[in-house]
């Protein structure tokens, strides 16, 4: 059943800044409500089928029933969100995001780790279980709207060897890293969108698979030098930079500089008394500068000469 009807959102406040989720906020023992909060606010779990309910179960991979699971070592706080599909239960889990960057998002850079916590070779040792990744720009829940599957982000059972039983999804032998940049999007400022993982019910017995270390980075590929992403007033005095960034601010602000690959290359704190940041050590090229100035998140592209 649906975990929540409030549909909290994960706010994305700056381009090229990654949102990350490690699922360690999941319970590490017993059963818990699928209404997620705290560090998992904005995420939802949906079970369908005759055995669906409003709880998920903590497991080391020993559980065999169709269910949604918080996987991890016994009593460990290092968790992963997963499931076992069956003929009477299917599980979806995902999140709603809101574009609060002040600019159109046309790309989403996605990565996560697929983990194998239980393996059952009864269906055959050549058939892989699967979790699909999908996104929707018009959904209002995990089941509404039009969804697009991303083949490059499909997770399949990592290791098909051995006898039936528990696997250690934290072991490299049972983990698969997946990443892809979704292009051609048109997510306007203020718009929401959803992502979800869907556990596929394969023919025969299913494995216990999970997702961990999820990352989503909003991007805009069309910004030119000097484009203001958010704020009617230009917060940078200079967008053609030699050695120093000069800001307009009335108070303290945290400043971050990213290269065109989305990597953080410089961070600093500025104030009205010292509103300059030394970037002399950065190579020539384009960068994106983000900051929280006077309570508003702003971002702008610069050229380092």
What are these regions (language model features)?
Residues 1-12:
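Bacterial Sec-dependent N-terminal signal peptides
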Residues 10-60:
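Extracellular carbohydrate-recognition regions
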Residues 41-103, 209:
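Surface-exposed, low-complexity/disordered Ser/Thr/Gly/Pro/Asn-rich loops and linkers
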Residues 93, 178-180, 273-277:
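Short strand-edge motifs at loop-to-beta-strand transitions and within beta-strands
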Residues 106-119:
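A short beta-strand element within beta-rich, extracytoplasmic domains
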Residues 227-305:
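C-terminal outer-membrane/trafficking sorting elements
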């Amino acid at each position: 059943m649906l975990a929540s009807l409030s549909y909290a959102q994960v706010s994305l406040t700056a381009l090229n800044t990654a949102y990350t989720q490690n699922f360690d906020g999941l319970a590490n023992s017993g059963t818990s409500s699928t209404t997620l909060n705290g560090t998992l606010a904005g995420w939802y779990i949906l079970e369908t089928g005759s055995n669906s309910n409003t709880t998920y179960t903590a497991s080391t991979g020993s559980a065999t029933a169709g269910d949604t699971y918080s996987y991890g070592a016994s009593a460990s706080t290092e968790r992963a969100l997963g499931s076992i599909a069956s003929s009477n239960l299917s599980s979806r889990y995902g999140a709603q995001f809101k574009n609060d960057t002040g600019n159109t998002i046309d790309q989403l850079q996605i990565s996560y780790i697929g983990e194998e916590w239980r393996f059952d070779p009864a269906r055959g040792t050549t058939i892989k279980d699967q979790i699909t990744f999908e996104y929707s720009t018009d959904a209002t829940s995990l089941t509404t709207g039009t969804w697009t599957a991303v083949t490059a982000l499909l997770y399949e059972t990592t290791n098909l060897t051995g006898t039936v039983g528990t696997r250690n999804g934290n072991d490299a032998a049972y983990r698969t890293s997946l990443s892809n940049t979704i292009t051609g999007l048109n997510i306007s400022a203020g718009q929401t969108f959803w992502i979800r993982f869907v556990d596929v019910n394969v023919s025969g017995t299913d494995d216990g698979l999970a997702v961990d270390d999820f990352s989503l980075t909003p991007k805009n590929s069309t910004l030119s030098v000097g484009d203001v992403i958010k704020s009617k007033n230009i917060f940078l005095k200079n967008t053609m930079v030699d050695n120093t960034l000069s800001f307009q601010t009335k108070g303290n602000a945290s400043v971050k500089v990213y290269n065109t690959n989305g990597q953080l290359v410089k961070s600093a704190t500025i104030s009205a008394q010292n509103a300059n940041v030394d970037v002399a050590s950065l190579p020539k090229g384009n960068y994106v500068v983000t900051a929280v100035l006077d309570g508003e998140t702003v971002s702008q592209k610069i050229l380092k000469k």
